């Protein structure tokens, strides 16, 4: 059966409206796509990493809650990446990023790719 494999960065977006925090949600470009894929029941994996801290655990829990396998996802000694998203009056976000030097996943293996599998990738 076809599977979708996402690869990219993960980050916790803390949303501000009128300079007050209103929500905190995991994100990242390919991460968001793979979460949507998991929500509709398509078998999917995410290759990436986050810190072994509270933020990182929130991200891992979010993947599990949305049907995304974390078999190829790493939690490292680095701190997890965080972004502050300041929403303007139109609802558009302006970001400030706080992240360690981002490393591509290394030690964990990746799933075998079949001919009909799909790979989603984004920035690191």
Model-predicted regions and their roles:
Residues 43, 47-123:
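Conserved N-terminal subdomain of the carbohydrate kinase-like
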Residues 7-8, 122-124:
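Glycine-rich beta-strand-to-loop/alpha-helix junction loops that act as flexible
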Residues 1-68:
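Glycine-rich phosphate/adenosyl-contacting loop at the front of the ribokinase-like
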């Amino acid at each position: 059966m076809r599977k979708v494999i996402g690869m990219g960065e993960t980050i916790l977006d803390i949303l501000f409206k009128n300079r007050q925090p209103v929500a905190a949600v995991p994100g990242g470009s390919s991460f968001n796509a793979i979460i949507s894929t998991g929500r509709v029941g398509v078998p999917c994996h995410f290759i990436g990493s986050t810190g072994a801290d509270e933020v990182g655990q929130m991200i891992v829990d979010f993947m599990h809650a949305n049907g995304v396998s974390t078999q190829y996802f790493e939690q490292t000694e680095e701190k997890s990446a965080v972004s502050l998203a300041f929403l303007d009056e139109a609802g558009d976000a302006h970001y400030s990023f706080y992240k360690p030097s981002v490393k591509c996943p290394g030690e964990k293996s990746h799933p075998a790719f079949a001919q009909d599998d799909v790979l989603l990738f984004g920035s690191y």
